[in-house]
């Protein structure tokens, strides 16, 4: 027998039962926006998290191989962009429900590192700028890459 039925059996007066049911309904209404937020968030966040786990494992393999022009490197590049898109969607859901948005993503870092190791410095700088626009502190990496290119920061 459920908890609700046990509680209802201990309430003896009809007024008490009515009041209890009203209170329960009020609490359910209070929880409704949070439950909607959780449902909408997890549809996107679960995909983001699964993809980030894949990227981390593949990055380890790529890092050990040092072959940043391999098929795996291009697969990771594609997955980083996909993860960044999920990251943006997670932030949108957070903001829609008045929650503090997710503060950063390693997908930006991995993508910037990948471009840097491929010698694609301007692309790496662009990724760092995008990360900064989401509140991540990628300025040191960006300035280091800009020095490699030999140009002034813009």
Located regions from the model:
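Alpha-solenoid repeat scaffolds
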Residues: 65-69, 86, 90, 121, ...
């Amino acid at each position: 027998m459920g908890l609700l039925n046990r509680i209802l059996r201990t309430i003896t007066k009809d007024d008490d039962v009515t009041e209890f049911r009203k209170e329960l309904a009020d609490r359910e209404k209070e929880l409704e926006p949070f439950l909607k937020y959780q449902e909408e968030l997890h549809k996107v966040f679960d995909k983001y998290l699964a993809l980030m786990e894949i990227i981390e494992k593949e990055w380890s393999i790529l890092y050990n191989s040092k072959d940043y022009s391999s098929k795996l490197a291009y697969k990771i590049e594609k997955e980083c962009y996909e993860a960044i898109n999920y990251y943006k969607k997670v932030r949108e859901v957070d903001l829609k429900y008045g929650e503090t948005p997710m503060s950063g993503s390693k997908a930006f870092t991995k993508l910037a590192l990948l471009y840097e190791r491929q010698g694609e410095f301007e692309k790496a700088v662009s990724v760092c700028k995008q990360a900064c626009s989401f509140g991540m502190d990628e300025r040191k990496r960006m300035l280091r890459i800009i020095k490699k290119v030999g140009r002034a920061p813009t």
